[in-house]
Amino acid sequence: MREVQGYPLPLGVQISENKINFSIAVPIEKKCQLLIYRAGRKRLYRQFEMETAVGEVRCIALTDIEPAEYEYNYLINGEVVVDPYVQALAGREHWGVKKETARHEIRGRFLSQEYDWEGDHTLQIPYHQVIAYSLHVRGFTRHA
């Protein structure tokens, strides 16, 4: 795992062929670090200073890293923070179990950008034939 120059946009995590780019908005006067953990393990694995900034956007990229094997958070002025642009969380797998970000129990996970849609496409239903409703899915299925 090596640190290389990152790019500021888009914010969040971007996975490319051979590197992962991290980008987050942090006020200039605050110190920011990237925390890397091995997936499923409690202890911090590596820590990187995020010194490169474009305005208030800090960025860093890592090469030689397998996304499925790692998780991440940020340390901003001594406070562990989950990425506000995170696509998936680790540590929230069980409903109602309280965990704390400060204890490194909740972290960002990496999602693969590749998904095989197997020829799926949008439904071609005329609007006047649609029956639509909304509900809170997690609350609706909580006791199922």
PLM feature spans:
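Beta-propeller domains
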Residues: 39-41
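Short proline/glycine-enriched turn/loop motifs at strand-loop junctions of beta-rich domains
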Residues: 25-31, 67
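Beta-strand signatures of extracellular beta-sandwich domains
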Residues: 33-35, 73
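The feature marks proteins involved in alpha-glucan
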Residues: 1-19, 45, 52-144
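Short beta-strand segments in beta-sandwich/barrel cores
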Residues: 31-32, 135
